[in-house]
C-alpha cells in the first residue's frame, strides 16, 4: 500500500490521451510507451505470462498459491485518458486532511468547489489529489492500474493470503470505445473479471447503457446569395431545424439514473453540406430502438417536406447493457459485495451512465462488472481522487481474490 500513491503519480506523467480520429490501435504512441513501463513493472514483480502485443494489450498472471482448483479471475483497467481534456504535463496537487471549502487549482482562477461538486462535503478528513486546473488528472483509469498492481504487490508480499490464478489486463483506447476490440478473452484466461474503472467508494456496477451513434447529414444547394431566392437550400438551416425537433428534455444535462438521452456531440456546418453527430443512450434495448426510430421518423418527415436537398441518417450500435450477460452469474456480484463489506465499504449498486471495457467483454464471454477507484469528475480539469478510497479499492481487490480461493477450498 505504501507505493500506491507513488505509482499513481508516476503513471499520470505519461500522456496517453486516445485519439478518435486515428484508426490504428493504439490511437496514440504514448499508450505503448506507458505499456512498456507497466510490462517491466510486472516482470519485476515476477509475474508469469507477461505479454504486450503490437496493439498495446498488456496481460500477465499471478499464479495460484493454493494446491486446489480455484477458478481464475481477472482485473482489468485501461491505459488511455479521455480526449475531452488534455492529459499532457499533468501536474497533480495534494490537499492533505481536506476540511471543506473551495480548493484552488494551480495559479489561475479555477477552483474545485463543494457548491458545484457536493461530493466534497463527504470527504472531510480525506487526503485528495487534484489537478492544477489545466489538464485532467488521469485517475480514469490510471488509478485503476495503480490499485490493481498495488493489490498484486500485497498478495505477493503476503503469501498467507490464499488466491487462485489472478489474470491482469490493461487495454488501450477504452475512452474512444475500442478497448475491447482486440482483447483476446481466451488468452486472458479468466472465468470472470472486474474492471477497476468506477468512481466513488463502494460503486459496484453491472448495468450500463445500450449505446449507438448517429450521424445526420444534411445535403443543401449552394447558390450565390444575391440570386438565391427559390434556389438555395442552406444545409445549416436544415441542421438547425432538425436539432430543434429533437426532445429537449432528453439530453445528458436533463437526465439521471435510469433515464436515457440523445446527446449532440459534434457538428460540421456548411451551406452545401452539414453534419450533426449524436450519441444515443438507453438502459433498455427496446428503448434504444425507439430512440433510433424517432430519429429516422424526423429524417423521413424532413425529406418529405423538401423539394430540393435531402437528409441522410446513419446509425451504428456501439455496445449493449452487460446486465443480461452478468445476471446469470450472481456469484460474481455477490463476491464483490462480500469483499466490500469485509473491508467496511458499503456497496453502492448503481447503473453506469456510460460504458466500460467490461460491457463489451461481457458479450465476448467474459462477465465483467465494474468496481470503484475512488475518483470523481472524470474527463475534465476538475477531476480528483481520494487517497483513502484508493486504498479501499486495493483492499477490495485483495479480498475478492482471497474470498474466491476460500469459497473453493
Curated annotation (Swiss-Prot):
Keyword list, A-Z: Aminopeptidase, Cytoplasm, Hydrolase, Metal-binding, Metalloprotease, Protease, Zinc
GO cellular component, one term: cytosol
MF (Gene Ontology): metallopeptidase activity; tripeptide aminopeptidase activity; zinc ion binding
Coiled-coil spans in chain: none
Free-text cofactor note: Binds 2 Zn(2+) ions per subunit.
Cofactor(s) listed: Zn(2+)
Binding site for Zn(2+) 1: 78, 140, 197
Catalytic activity as recorded in UniProt: Release of the N-terminal residue from a tripeptide
Binding site residues for Zn(2+) 2: 140, 175, 379
Pfam families: M20_dimer, Peptidase_M20
Entries under PANTHER family matching the protein: PEPTIDASE T
Role summary: Cleaves the N-terminal amino acid of tripeptides.
Family the entry assigns: Belongs to the peptidase M20B family.
Protein name (Swiss-Prot/TrEMBL): Peptidase T
Source lineage: Bacteria, Pseudomonadati, Pseudomonadota, Gammaproteobacteria, Vibrionales
Amino acid at each position: 500500500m505504501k507505493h500506491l500513491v507513488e505509482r499513481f503519480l508516476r503513471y499520470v506523467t505519461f500522456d496517453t490521451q486516445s485519439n478518435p480520429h486515428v484508426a490504428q490501435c493504439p490511437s496514440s504512441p504514448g499508450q505503448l510507451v506507458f505499456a512498456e513501463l507497466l510490462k517491466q513493472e510486472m516482470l519485476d514483480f515476477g509475474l508469469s505470462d507477461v505479454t504486450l502485443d503490437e496493439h498495446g494489450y498488456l496481460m500477465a498472471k499471478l499464479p495460484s498459491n493454493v494446491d486446489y482448483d480455484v477458478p481464475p479471475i481477472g482485473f482489468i483497467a485501461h491505459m488511455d485518458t479521455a480526449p475531452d481534456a488534455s492529459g499532457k504535463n499533468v501536474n497533480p496537487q495534494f490537499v492533505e486532511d481536506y476540511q471543506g471549502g473551495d480548493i484552488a487549482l494551480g495559479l489561475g482562477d479555477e477552483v474545485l468547489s463543494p457548491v458545484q461538486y457536493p461530493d466534497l462535503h463527504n470527504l472531510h478528513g480525506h487526503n485528495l489529489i487534484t489537478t492544477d486546473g489545466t489538464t485532467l488528472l488521469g485517475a480514469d483509469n490510471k488509478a485503476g492500474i495503480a490499485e490493481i498492481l498495488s493489490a498484486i504487490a500485497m498478495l505477493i508480499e503476503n503469501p498467507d493470503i490464499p488466491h487462485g490464478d489472478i489474470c491482469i489486463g490493461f487495454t488501450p483506447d477504452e475512452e474512444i470505445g475500442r478497448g475491447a476490440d482486440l482483447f483476446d478473452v481466451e488468452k486472458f484466461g479468466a472465468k470472470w473479471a472486474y474492471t477497476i474503472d468506477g468512481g466513488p467508494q463502494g460503486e459496484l456496477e453491472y448495468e450500463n447503457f445500450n449505446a449507438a451513434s448517429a450521424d445526420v447529414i444534411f445535403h443543401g444547394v449552394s447558390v450565390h446569395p444575391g440570386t438565391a431566392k427559390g434556389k438555395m437550400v442552406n444545409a445549416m438551416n436544415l441542421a438547425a431545424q432538425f436539432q430543434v425537433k429533437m426532445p429537449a428534455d432528453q439530453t445528458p444535462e436533463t437526465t439521471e439514473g435510469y433515464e436515457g438521452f440523445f446527446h449532440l456531440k459534434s457538428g460540421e456546418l456548411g451551406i452545401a453540406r452539414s453534419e450533426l453527430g449524436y450519441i444515443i443512450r438507453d438502459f433498455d434495448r427496446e428503448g434504444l430502438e425507439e430512440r433510433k426510430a424517432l430519429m429516422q421518423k424526423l429524417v423521413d418527415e424532413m425529406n418529405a417536406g423538401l423539394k430540393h436537398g435531402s437528409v441522410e441518417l446513419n446509425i451504428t450500435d456501439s455496445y449493449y447493457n452487460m446486465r443480461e450477460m452478468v445476471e446469470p452469474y450472481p456469484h460474481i456480484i455477490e463476491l464483490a459485495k462480500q469483499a466490500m463489506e469485509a473491508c467496511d465499504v458499503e456497496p453502492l449498486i448503481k447503473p453506469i451512465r456510460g460504458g466500460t471495457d467490461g460491457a463489451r467483454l461481457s458479450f465476448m464471454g467474459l462477465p465483467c462488472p465494474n468496481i470503484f477507484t475512488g475518483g470523481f469528475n472524470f474527463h475534465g480539469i476538475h477531476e480528483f481522487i481520494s487517497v483513502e478510497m484508493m486504498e479501499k479499492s486495493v483492499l477490495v481487490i485483495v479480498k475478492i481474490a482471497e474470498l474466491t480461493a476460500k469459497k473453493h477450498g
